[in-house]
């Protein structure tokens, strides 16, 4: 069993995948495996089958879904996700793996720099005062972020202890790529240490992502994230955050009209108590690894009860 599974995502842009893959293979650490999650369009022109496991995921709609699928296919104790276009520095993984020597470490947040000017793209993600998702350190100089803390890694470049993440149900797919990594980081903080490692450096110019999220979806996803955090926030903060975020989007709409759509979808979801959340509760919709497992167990249990009833009759 390898210690580290390196997972590279490819959704549309083959050159970005190859840029990342070349750097990973050149600097590949010992005791590791490399997986590529692709949309079915990559044909391995360089015959890398002996070094890389290619997994076709043509039905995947998000990076979050691809990550959950990759965790089920990977063999490593630590899983490292990279979006196509993210290029690691030499020995980048050594820094992160040292932190995992501590048993309480459940995730490591690497530093992502812009390839063009070496300014900070992000040092993970954090939850703002209004419970939005923000990129930590965006636009700052490299040396200015060493004292900053994050709530979790950005999924485009992230390290996780796989057993801990999977024990929590993996990534919540119904939160989309916009909030699933922040949600995972906050949940992992409840069971262990999320370590910010500004000396673990990767670089990015352009990043391969599956799709652009509409303003309507963005507002709905944020409401769903707030609903998940409602118990820890308290009802008052939950309602205040919903209204203040909507008001801010309306006030800034002249600069970005799409924010009106986001505010509308947020308030609509709040009023209707989020149709997707209700569907998950009523129908057992699968939004994570954990929910899939529970649904299978429930079906097996129901089947056993039915069989017992038939025999009794």
Model regions and ranges:
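Glycine-rich, basic loop-to-helix element that forms the pyrophosphate-binding segment
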Residues: 57-74
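A short, conserved alpha-helix in the catalytic core of glycosyltransferases
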Residues: 96, 150-169, 174-201
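Non-catalytic, C-terminal membrane-associated alpha-helical segments of glycosyltransferases
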Residues: 214-220, 231-313
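N-proximal low-complexity "stem/linker" segments adjacent to membrane-targeting elements
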Residues: 1-23
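Short aromatic/hydrophobic "clamp" motif used to bind/position activated sugar donors
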Residues: 79
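Conserved donor NDP-sugar-binding/catalytic core segment of glycosyltransferases
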Residues: 86-87, 91-127
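Short, acidic, metal-binding catalytic loop of nucleotide-sugar glycosyltransferases
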Residues: 22-31
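Short, flexible, basic/aromatic active-site loop/helix in glycosyltransferases
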Residues: 127-150
